[in-house]
Design a protein with these regions (language model features):
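Helix-loop-helix "hairpin" substructures at the membrane interface of multi-pass membrane proteins
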Residues: 143-222, 240, 245-251
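Membrane-embedded helix boundary and interhelical linker motif in transport proteins
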Residues: 31-85, 89, 265-273
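Inter-helical junctions in multi-pass inner-membrane proteins, predominant
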Residues: 2-17, 144, 165-170, 196-237, ...
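Membrane-interfacial amphipathic/re-entrant helices at transmembrane-helix boundaries
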Residues: 1-21, 49, 60-70, 97-101, ...
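Hydrophobic alpha-helical transmembrane segments of polytopic membrane proteins
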Residues: 20, 25, 77-79, 232-255, ...
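Single transmembrane alpha-helix segments in multi-pass membrane proteins
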Residues: 4-54, 85-101, 237-245
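Transmembrane helix-bundle core of multi-pass membrane transporters
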Residues: 93-94, 99-168, 195, 261-280, ...
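Alpha-helical transmembrane segments within multi-pass membrane transporters and channels
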Residues: 61-109, 116, 250-255, 259, ...
Length: 307
């Protein structure tokens, strides 16, 4: 039972990261029908930016929470500026192009960001400092540390704030109007280009937060670290129903729990033939099953393709 509780905790923490990144995928797709495959690399840039700030300021004797906060602020600023530039330079000129063109561009942008990060930060793994030390907390026989608690709290606060922004603010109404019909929204005074740029910036901020939390929890950063979390977050978005904010949240958390439980019990289920290092397989098994059985996702609705 203790193992089960521990895996649930680990899954909720991992799923929180997936949910934050999945929201970026689903927001962009909901407005311009683009799968931004460079989104995982934005997470990576956020983590590496935070690492740079934290290691640069650590010798000044700042407390761990202050270093983490400053690293997070720097990551959000850099990632927001980066995603704003990507949207304006790489995606906006292709907005009316065949759908394959921006998809290929997104893949190319992903490789470009990985290469630039490798040049700037070098290809070796870097240790992310332990910024919130302290005795772990016991829940039954399971353990949760300060960073994991922070991830869960930050995720709940962030997701609640995002839902409020989308449903209760002027920007949120403009985003929903643009997603429904950008031409009609423009006639009603909405500026679609501004709304789309704002969506990319918000998605980047979420990815930056996820990147910093991911690095703080797992303790290392590297230029390829965003690929798998980004791919799994895309799986989570599809799992929950891409284009649906609640679906991205639910899909991310469920995928994290499924992956964690799979890693914890796969050895017992296969008689030791397979180990926990096969945990990545579960995310893609889920993707295949969802695309086969319910392609619109758990909370998505089957709709006609827009012209």
């Amino acid at each position: 039972m203790d193992t089960f509780i521990q895996q649930i905790i680990n899954g909720l923490v991992l799923g929180s990261v997936y949910a934050l990144v999945a929201l970026g995928y689903t927001m962009v797709y909901g407005i311009i029908n683009l799968i931004n495959f460079a989104h995982g690399e934005v997470l990576m840039v956020g983590a590496l930016t935070s690492w740079t700030v934290v290691t640069a300021l650590a010798p000044f004797g700042l407390p761990g929470w202050a270093l983490l906060l400053l690293g997070l602020i720097a990551a959000v600023i850099v990632c927001s500026a980066l995603n704003f530039a990507i949207e304006k330079i790489a995606y906006r000129p292709l907005r009316n192009a065949p759908r394959l063109a921006p998809l290929i561009t997104a893949m190319g942008m992903s490789l470009l960001l990985q290469t630039l990060a490798m040049i700037i930060w070098k290809p070796n793994y870097k240790s992310f400092p332990i910024l919130l030390p302290g005795e772990p907390h016991m829940i039954g026989g399971a353990v949760i540390n300060n960073v994991q608690i922070l991830i869960l709290v930050m995720t709940v606060v962030t997701l609640s704030s995002l839902m409020y922004l989308v449903n209760r603010t002027k920007l949120g109404r403009a985003m929903r109007a643009t997603a429904e019909n950008p031409r009609v929204a423009a006639l009603m005074g909405v500026r679609p280009d501004t709304v789309i740029s704002a969506t990319f910036v918000i998605g980047a901020a979420l990815a930056a937060l996820a990147g910093v939390m991911y690095a703080a929890n797992y303790g290392s950063v590297q230029h390829t670290m965003g690929f798998l979390p980004g791919l799994k977050a895309f799986t989570a978005a599809v799992f929950g129903g891409i284009g649906n904010l609640a679906g991205a949240m639910v899909g991310g958390v469920l995928l994290g729990v499924i992956e964690s439980l799979g890693a914890g019990y796969i050895g017992d289920l296969t008689g030791g033939v397979l180990g926990s290092h096969y945990q990545d397989v579960f995310a893609f098994v889920v993707l295949i099953l969802v695309l086969t059985l319910r392609p619109q996702g758990l909370l998505g609705e089957r709709v006609a393709d827009r012209a």
